Amino acid sequence: MASQTQLRLIIYEFTRKIQTRLNTQKLHSFVTKSKLARDPYFATQLARFYALNDDLISARKLFDVFPERSVFLWNSIIRAYAKAHQFTTVLSLFSQILRSDTRPDNFTYACLARGFSESFDTKGLRCIHGIAIVSGLGFDQICGSAIVKAYSKAGLIVEASKLFCSIPDPDLALWNVMILGYGCCGFWDKGINLFNLMQHRGHQPNCYTMVALTSGLIDPSLLLVAWSVHAFCLKINLDSHSYVGCALVNMYSRCMCIASACSVFNSISEPDLVACSSLITGYSRCGNHKEALHLFAELRMSGKKPDCVLVAIVLGSCAELSDSVSGKEVHSYVIRLGLELDIKVCSALIDMYSKCGLLKCAMSLFAGIPEKNIVSFNSLILGLGLHGFASTAFEKFTEILEMGLIPDEITFSALLCTCCHSGLLNKGQEIFERMKSEFGIEPQTEHYVYMVKLMGMAGKLEEAFEFVMSLQKPIDSGILGALLSCCEVHENTHLAEVVAENIHKNGEERRSVYKVMLSNVYARYGRWDEVERLRDGISESYGGKLPGISWF
């Protein structure tokens, strides 16, 4: 018979293998037969493996029968419930560990911080931070890193920054977390400043640093900065790393530079699911929907399984192309994957069928959703509105309120779009007022555009002009563009020129869409010099070479 030490070595080697649920059950049986079931190390490993395979029942049974629970075992079960988003149980377990003889360690607080950020419980997150400080772990690297990340994810960037600055000697992982936090919260410039400070303090960036640095570059206006980040990746030979490659593809996609995104993608030796998803999303964002569908087809052929978010994006491309054939193919694929009940996928399917003219299919899908939420309602209301079924769309809005759901900005965009398609000016004005007074939602550009279109369609151009001029300055050029379009339709050249002058003051005259409209207005006035100037500039809008920039 093998000694206890030999058995432990055998079991240790077994635990290093990939653990399926069946393998974990075999390991559990072997550990029990070897009389090592009460060994804290193996109990912790088994609980962790059960949790990884989403078998909470077995993990909890193991935890409950174990007499002497180490902090590692507590952490395993807390992590398991946090992974399953059962945060009430997580809190209950934390209360139990505080009452027990076991003292929570830095990993315990790190796990709890992640749980609170996942549930967007900022009050609980602050409370855990306070308890960690009292226990002497507030400035621990692991605990601090998790809390900084949790604060950032919850949008509490000030708290995250204060905690980061209070930690005496942050390691590279903590620097990366803070740079990522700044990027995700929209402070890309602060992330870059921190990146420079990090290097000044003697830390060399790794692949995770560069991924964090790309996180805040999400706008076409930041393309120069994006190129500089890419150049730095090339300089330190990190561009070939799979994580960095995927991040660069995603960065360029969000900056609407699909050519650079494709170039990086093609340089990746074996593009994984993340890289493919990033490029497909980029194609969709840039309006290259056929390319998005083509790459998605290649992804399917390769055997990679997309997630619900990617499927929803691809269905959006089908909707934009009004391609019901591809849409139905994706729907069949969704059923084979078992994703047909996912609320994001269902909502995307409803939107796709509506925009492809198959409203009956959309309504049938909506009826089959077991737990409808505001996203699915929004998709159906928009579909009904686009097809002119205004009364049914407003019935669905009433149903939203009766179910106790809270309408959001998109709900009111869909309702105002419905009013536009059916010419319901009075109803649109009523909805616009209710949005502000009853639901406390501040109108966005899209809502104002619909209101201008409604008034313009009714021929009330002067009223629309007064409405637009009453808005806070500077007025968004999208709203002015909608008014200019209405002036063109009704051939009101006098008002069109006034609106055109406002667009010119906004500095948006350079955009091709406004150049075309403005040139049409000036043509009616016979101002041919202005027409020639504007139309000559259209072909040059994107022809110039941008100057270089470097902040490294």
UniProtKB/Swiss-Prot annotation:
Keywords: Repeat. It comes from the Eukaryota. GO terms for cellular component: mitochondrion. GO terms for molecular function: RNA binding. PPR repeats lie at residues 39-69, 70-104, 105-139, 140-170, 171-205, 206-240, 241-271, 272-306, 307-341, 342-372, 373-407, 408-438, 444-474. Belongs to the PPR family. PCMP-E subfamily. This is Putative pentatricopeptide repeat-containing protein At1g64310. It comes from Arabidopsis thaliana. The lineage of its organism: Eukaryota, Viridiplantae, Streptophyta, Embryophyta, Tracheophyta.
